[in-house]
Structure formats: C-alpha cells, structure tokens
Amino acid sequence: MEVPLVAYLHSCPNCGGPITSDRLASGLPCRECLPDGAKAGSIKQVITALRKRKALQGLAWVEAYLRGYEEFAEFFKRIVGFEMWGAQRLWARRFVRGKSFAIVAPTGSGKTTFILIATLYSAKQGKRALLIFPTSALAHQAYKKLLTFAERGGVSLKALAYHSLLTEREKKEALEALERGDFDVLVTTSAFLPKRFELLSRYKFDFVAADDVDSILRATSKNIDRILRLLGVSDAVLNTALEVINLTKQLRKAEVAGDLKEVERLDQEMAKLRAKLREEVQRLKLGVFVASGALAKARRTVRLLLFREILGFDVGGRAEGLRNVVDLYVEASDNVIEQTLALVKRLGPGGIIYVQDRELGEAIVERAREAGLAVEHFFRPRRGVLESFERGELAALVGLASSRSALVRGIDLPHVIRYVIFVGVPKFKFRVRLEEFSIPAYLTFLYNVRSVLAGDARYKADRLIGQLKRLAPYALSVQEALKKASEGAELSSFDRHAVDVVKSAVEFVNSLLQNEEIRKAIETSSEVKLAYIDGEMYVLVPDVTTYIQGSGRTSRLYAGGLSKGLSVVIVDDPKVFHALKRELSLRFDEAEFKHLGEADLDKILADVDRDRKTIRDIMEGRLVPAARGVDLMRTILMVVESPTKARTIANFFGRPSLIISEGIPIYEVSTGDAVLMVTASLGHIYELPTSLNKIDQRQREVLAKWFGDFKHGNYDGENYAVIVKEYGFVPVYNKIWRCRGAVYVDDIDIPPGCKPLDVLEAIRNIAVEVDTVLLGTDPDSEGEKIAFDLYLGLRPYVQDIRRVEFHEVTRRAILNALANPRGVNFSLVKAQIVRRVEDRWIGFGLSKILQANFKNPNLSAGRVQTPVLGWIVNTYEESLKNRVYNVELQLNDVDIRLQVPRDVLDVLRKKKRVAIKLVARERRQVNPPPPYTTDELLRDAVNKLGLSADYAMRLAQDLFESGLITYHRTDSTRVSTAGIAIAREYIVRKFGEGVFKPRSWGEAEEGAHEAIRPTRPIDVEELRGLVNAGVIQLAIQLTKSHYQLYDIIFRRFMASQMEPSVVEVAKYNVEIDGHVIQLERTVGVAYMGFQTLYQLTPVEPELPTGTLDVVIKRYRVVRRVLSQADVLALMRQRGIGRPSTYAHILQVLAKRYYVYVTGRTKLMIPTKRGREIFRFLKEAFGKLVSEDRTRLIEQYMDAIEVGKARYEEVIAELYDEFRKEVLPHLAS
C-alpha cells in the first residue's frame, strides 16, 4: 500500500474512526467508509458516495446543511438576479443552520437585501418573521422592497407594516391584522416594540432581524428582553440569564473594589447559575435573531450580555481602529474664520467643521452665509439639515469637537463626507475641581505628565491611572456616585470606592500643580499645557479620541475596502498639537501629519472622490459583485495557537463580535474587503499516545485491519505509536483531549463522566461556513505541524485552506500575511515528525530502561537532554579536582577580585601584600552586541533579571502574542528594514541623528526569521504609561517581569542600532610572591554611544600602583558550576537543541531532579541521581547520546527542513539505530 505520512485516531469526519493523512488531504473519509479508489472533488460528492453505500453517519448534518444552503442560494438568485457574495454566503450558511448571529459588515455589503430574502424564505416555509428598523423611512423602504421581492419570487406573503409614515387608517388596519394574527411578516420600528409589546408577545417569531442594534438600545435597553421573548425565550430563562449578568456586574465591581472574599463567593455562584442556564436554553427551540450594525461605545449596556448568555453571540462595536485618512495641518492665521472658509472653498462639498465652542461655530456659519457658502450648524441633531447635506445642498456642517457631539459619533454618511476641518486642536480644558472631574481628561493628563515625575509621584500617578482606567466603563455610575456623595446619600461599596478614587485623583493633580518644581517641568514639557484664564489655571491636553472619531467620519468601511478621507487641523496651540501627533502615532502605525502646503490636494481629493463614487454605486445598486469580477467580501477563518494572539489580532480591526462554538471563542471583525474570524487551536491538537494499548479498542482494531500486525521483528509498534512495515513508517497520532483543565493523549485516561473538549470539532463547526481558512500558527516547524494537522482536519469541510506566516503580531504584519498566503511547508512538517518519532524511540526507550534499572517510574532520558546533563556533571566534578578561590581584596579605597590557587591564597593570607604595575592604557572602540537571539535573551533573563529560563520563555511568548516583540524563538540576528525604521524613530527622538547607526546584522542568513526586537519605538516607561492610560490595550495584564523582559529586549535592540562606544582601558599586572595575574579594567568612557542605553562595560576606578598592603575582605572556594545561562550558551555554540527547546531541556533536568537550581543566577548543581543517571547512560549508550551524534541528528533535522535530506532515509537510519542500540536492552 501507499505509505501515508501519518495516521490520526478519532478523526474520520464521517465515522469518527482512524484515518490516514492521504485520505484527509483528498477530502475523503476513511477507507472503512469509502473504499480505496473512491474519487471526490467536494464534500457534496463525498456525501453522495456515502449515501449510495448507506454509510452516511457523522456527515449527515452537513448534507442537511448543504441542501438548505443550496435551496436558499437558488431562492436568493431567483429573486435578486445574481448570486450571493462573500458575507451574504456566510450569513446564509448560519441562517439555514438555525444560528443567531451579529452581522459584521460595512456599507454596501448587502445586509438589508439578505435580511429581506431570509424573511421571505422563512415565510415560504410557513414561519413568522419580525423586521425592526431604526426609522420609519427605512421601515417603509424595506416593506416596499420586500413586496417587490415577494412578487419576483412568487411568494404568497401576508406582510404588515407599522410606522409613522402610514395614514391613521393604514395604522388601524395593520393593528387589526396583527390582533387577528393574520400576517407572516411584520415590518416596524424600534419604537413599536415597547408601545405594542403586549400585542406582539402573543406570537412566537421564527425569525427576527434588527437592522440597527444601536437604535434598539436608544429606544430602551429593555427591547433586548422583548426581542428574546418574541424568539421564544421563557421568563424563567430570561430571569436566570439576568441573574448571571447581574452576578457578572457584581463580580467586576467587587474586583475593582478589591473585595477578594466577595469575588470568590460570586465566582462560585455564577458558575452554578451558568450551568443551570445552559440546560434551560437547550430545552427551548428558539427562533433565529440577526443583529445588524455596530454598537456605539456608550450603548454597551450589560443587557447586551443576554445575547451571549442565551443565543451564543455578542455584538461588536464600530471599527474605529481602522482609518485611511490623510492627516494634514496648517498654522492658525490671525483670522481663523476666513481661513476656515477658504479651506471649504478649496476642498468643496462634503465637509465637517469641528469647533471648540458654539460661539465660534455660529460665527463661522454667519460669515459663510455672508460669503454665499451653504454651511449650517449641527450642534444638535437636525433632520432637515442632515438631509440637505446628504443631497449636496450644503457644503459643510459645523459641530462641536467633542466625543459627545452629534457630528463626531452620530453621523455615518460614507458616500457624502469627504473631509473634516478641526478649527483648533481638539483638546480637554479643565480646572482641577471635583465638579469638573472627567475620567478621560484626567487619564490623558496623568499619562502625559508621568514622564516628568519620579519616584513616589510616578508610582501614585500609575496607581491612579490604573484605578481610573478600571472605572472608565462605569463612567455614568461614577458621576451618579459623586452626585450621591455631594447630597449625603447612602453609598454602596462601589460608590465609595469610586468617590475615593476620584477625590484622590483631584487631590493628587492639585498637589502636582502646586509643586513649583513639578509645575515648571510640566510647563516645559512637550505634552501638557497650563493656561491662565481670568487668573485661574487650566490644564490643556489633547483629546485624541475626538480626533480619531471625528476624522474617522471621512474613512468608513464599505464592501470593497476602507474609503479614503482627508483631515485638516488648524493648529492654534503647537504644544497640544505635538502631544496629539505623538499619541496618534502610538495608536496607529501609519499615522503621520503633513503640512498642508506640502500636500498634493488635487490627487488626494481625486482618490477621495473615487471611493465616494464606488460607495454610491454600490448603495444604489449600480455596482453588483459580478461587475468587478472579484468577491469583495470574502469570509475568512484564521486559526492561531493561543486565545491571547486571537484577541490581539481581532482587536486590530475594531471591537469584535463574539461567537461561542462548543466552548471555543471566535472573534469576528470586518477588514473592509473581508469578514475575518479569529480563533485559537490552544496549541497542538494531536500528539502520539503513550501506547496504542491505551486507545479505544475499535480504533485499534481498524488500524490492525489496515496495517496488519503492529510488530516488526522484535519491535512492537503498539508500544511506541509508530507502525513499522517493510514499505515504511506510520506514526499514529491521537487527538489531544481537554477536560476540566487537564490534557489527555490516551483514551483510557479521560475521567468517567467527563465530555472532553474537542477543539478540532469546534473549529470545523465554524470552518464549514466560511470561504477560506488561513492557518496563522507560529513561524517554525512546531507551528507548521499544527498548521498541517489543522489543514488535514478541516480539508473535508473546506476547499480553500492556506498558511499565513507573520513574525510579529502587529496590524501591518497581519494585513501583509492576509495578502500573501502560501501552502503548508511539508519539509518543516516532516522535520517535526522526525523529531517527535526520534524522541519517542530514543527518549521513550531510554526512559523505560532507566525506570527499570533504577526502579523509578519518574525518570526520563533524551538525545539532547543527556549531553546537556553531561556538561553539568563533568564541569562540577572537574571543579572538585582543581580547586581555586575567589578573593576580594581592598587596597586603599579600591576593591579588586582575583581568582587564585590554594598556594597563592596561603601566601596572600600570610603577607597581605601585592605589587601592582600599570602595563598599558589605551582607548578602545566597543561595538554594540547584535539584537537578541533566543539563547542570548534567556541568558540575560537569567543573569540580569534572575528569572528561570522556562519562565522567561513564557513571558516572551506573552510579549509576542500581545504584539510587543517579534517572534521569540529564533537563532537569527537579522534586522529588517521595518526594524531599522523603528530604531531610527526612537533613537533620533531621544538622542539625535548623530547617535543612530543602522545595522542589518545577519546579512548572510537565509529565510525570513529576524532577531528579537520591539515592534514599536516605545521604551518600557512609555509602554507602562500607555498601557495604564489605555492607549495601548492588550489581551493580557502585564506583570513586573513582563516589563523587565521587554526592557532588556528594547535596550539591546536599540543599542544594536547606535554608534559604538569609546572607552578607556587600563591593563595591570598584579604580582603575589612571583605569581602574576593580568587584569583589565574599563576606567573611563570617552564617548557613550550605545552604552547610553545598554551598559556593556561598567566603569571601575583605577588601581593604585606599587607595592601595597591589602585587606582580605573575603574568599571562598570556586566550585565551577554551570548556570542556566552557561548551559544555554553551550547549547547554541555546540549545536545542541533548538530555540524552541532550550528552556524546556533545562526545565526537564530540574523536574526530574537530575540537577537543582539555586541562586539568582540559577546555578545548576548535579544531584547524586543526576550523576548516576549520566554515568549509566554514558557507559551503556555512550555513542547514542554522545554530543557528536546528537549534533549530527540536529543537522539531519535542519537538512530535512530546507529540503536537503529525505525524510524517509533519516527516519530509517534512526529506526536502525534504535533497533540495534536500544531495543535489545528493552527486550532483556
């Protein structure tokens, strides 16, 4: 038979039995379900073949789903006139599966059309539907379109409409029909729900669609409860869900208040209640709810959690993290009103003018009228004015530059708004008074001033920033608490905490401004301005949120991308503008202000207008998908390893919607040209079981039927989960089962009564709905193997599965990866499989021998582990033979340390005198070290930070997945052009152009790997401030150790891009009774260069010369013991191990108690057990575990990775070695 690369247990998509990789790669079920020779090009053909053989089992649900989808797709095409595209296909797939969901898609993606067709499809099947629109005009338009569609589709439809545009007679007739239940569909507005809910509640609706979720909340948040009841949710279920939500709210407040006892109580109570809720919901046959539109931040009421708790999804927010805006600025002239109107004339219609106060806005409108310009104010919503603006009758609208302004958040006209003008830099201006307190203003102030604070003041600022950030989601509750406190009303524990924090913030800011030294530092800083108006001090800081939201009106997502917009800031305050630029650049990598005079306005406006035309054509139906020849809104599922990475990626594109698939969270966002879902595999999804005897009997029987006897000579593949036949080798992988926080690879170990989490099934459940799956696992052989397993596991369900690779988790890197997918690299996969099989044969085999000989089941051995243990043992034993001493001497006021043998120490103790001679003094150029590789980072983490290697590796993983550093498993020192640009920005800003010296390092290295470096030009103090202030929002909470590790990565990288240092070096001979010791000391620095950031050669005082009396301060025997840092250096130098295994090897040695780790520098001292184990392995298996053989095997693996060695030949050689060197010992 043809040799499959691997076999997988429990993985046939149809029967759940074993299956080989070749079958999965062809999209086929196992050969038990379909015999060899079966051909299939799609899952539909597979299902047809299975049904013909009467073998259809696990794929039966897919058959029903595909049938429903095809019926819906044909129905859609018949009515609309063209096929569904991108996002519509995704929504249709969910709809026919009876799933409720949020529609995450931009203007022109066909949301309303889909909702109307889904409504007709439901009605055709005898189901009842309810459509809710935000306005009467939209409801009327949808109703008319629904009737047109019904006529086209030949659907007999009883449709009702109720809204304010109807006549009184029409309203009466509609209500009477509603009373009689004589309808299939009701089209109405969000205002109708609370007014007529008693009437509506008589009916259960099978399909409910809300065209604008935000409008539902504006009417009343209780509309959420009402919609759920209309879907069939009982009062009991609703009340249970509300209890869960209330407990969640209490839990968060208890966490904010620091009440740990209450947190624990609420946590336990909530877990029980959630389990009860899940049981109740499963008993109900609920209708389908489709929530269209995003939520304004202010609308994110906790009642929205009802959707998550009952329907399994969460509604997302607006994609304000996406922008395609040209940011320009110009200095304010003496007459800013005339300057503004001149800009309006130059830029044309479709403008918004943001002003700091109403008085200036009204003056601009009045002067515009005098000049014949059609400009109106929009300080409050004015429907007629907005409609005139949309029709092009007004050139611009004037509104307040505030995040609460109707023109900043309450307007979305992507086909109309072309540009915005900020008359003055948007800013917070406040006096430090309790009654003027604002969380955003104080957060901005504290973040911007922390850089001029030191010691206790900075600590207090950071603490307050953290407390205010945690209170920010409860801003309204905080204001209510302040009001209650001022009135002397009774306060809850949360109220008291909020009031205490606010008072502390106001008092602290006051104390800063009253401190003359700090006030002067603030006044001379470039981030905060203090202004004196009518004798009172005001604080001025940039309002970045308003700028982002306001300028974002010009750049909106639509079905085709992100429209281009223009923003012009008339700068009235250079200092506040500088702070605005700085913070904007930290939030958006691409953001950069250019002077208006340097911009090509004609080209910019041409690009802006091209997008507006496209948007209008889509909105008015003149541009259908086929006209472009491309699928504008493709649907993508990206699978990464960790939930942290998944959340980080999703958050690049706005506040994601959330879907829960069998306990696995999937984050959904729109990128403009795609609907992107991101989820995590939780690491590897397959592993070799410890023995085939420990898997399900049926699985084992099927394998035996295919491969025959598992034995091959004296080798029994059942013991190693690797089947060996004359025709080749077949590793057998089992699913990794997750149950109650534990992980299992053997079936028999799963606890009774526990239904394990099947990650692959959860991902399959979502993958079947999308067009494309992208596998975004780590860029190394381990990540490639995970991608390979996912590819095979999903292949029967999805035709288009590709691999994406990124070495940093940044928005730029993710977009580049999305645009450049590739296939799975089978050379990397094969190398990883060989490593795993080699470890199973050699490591597992040697471990069994050790366990038998030493009668200890906890012992282990491995090819890499053993020579590393040997270095530790040999070094330690050598130190016992040749004893030397560290001696610390004091001569005059200078201390020196020497290393001397015992006889010299005896002379020194007796005479207490040394002779010191200055041999030479020279200036020496010291070049910076290259940026970190994995081993170097771990060495410094151990030596400088006192962290263990495995803990440092976990911290680095967190930093990578949070988007703060590049990939941390690397042996490359190469720096990309993007990395050099980051270094340039930081170094020039901090130290000037002259210190910057770009180096790409590692020019001769192959591949795309790069050194470990930061992804942004922000040092650790800036990072701490940005995280505390909420400017940078991460998926995890950073600890002190995270910051420490980031700091050394940042400093090392920046140093690698700086000028060399020039130091003064003194060379001495120290003579003790004829024994001469040579010393070198750096005694001065002529030019700091890179050592400004990264001290490589600390300066020591010069030594006095001549014959000197000394005081012996201390001495001790030097036991030459390797530290973790020393071992890491040896592993890299001698080619033993890989970046991904360095820390793991050290961890295993300590875990098995072969060494114990002690001290800040993590010295590795061999134990008696460790020494005995090494001696045994060296004597019995010296050749097998020798350093040379281990290095050669590593070279084999590397050669497989790059396609220079054949997988089959290497694994055959390893098997031969195992059979000759290890197997005889096991047999005996």
Swiss-Prot record:
Reactions this protein catalyses: ATP + H2O = ADP + phosphate + H(+)
Motif range (DEAD box): 211-214
Single Gene Ontology MF annotation: ATP binding
Needed cofactors: Zn(2+); Mg(2+)
CDD domains in UniProt: DDXDc_reverse_gyrase, SF2_C_reverse_gyrase, TOP1Ac, TOPRIM_TopoIA_RevGyr
Main location: cytoplasm
Cofactor info, note text: Binds 1 zinc ion per subunit.
Binding-site positions, Zn(2+): 12, 15, 30, 33
Keyword DNA-binding: yes
Pfam families listed in its UniProt record: DEAD, Topoisom_bac, Toprim, zf_Rg
Binding of ATP, residues: 88, 105-112
Subunit structure: Monomer.
Remaining remarks: This enzyme is the only unique feature of hyperthermophilic bacteria/archaea known and seems to be essential for adaptation to life at high temperatures. It may play a role in stabilization of DNA at high temperatures.
Functional note: Modifies the topological state of DNA by introducing positive supercoils in an ATP-dependent process, increasing the linking number in steps of +1. Binds to single-stranded DNA, transiently cleaves and then rejoins the ends, introducing a positive supercoil in the process. The scissile phosphodiester is attacked by the catalytic tyrosine of the enzyme, resulting in the formation of a DNA-(5'-phosphotyrosyl)-enzyme intermediate. Probably involved in rewinding DNA strands in regions of the chromosome that have opened up to allow replication, transcription, DNA repair and/or for DNA protection.
Family stated for the protein in its record: In the N-terminal section; belongs to the DEAD box helicase family. DDVD subfamily.
UniProt protein name: Reverse gyrase
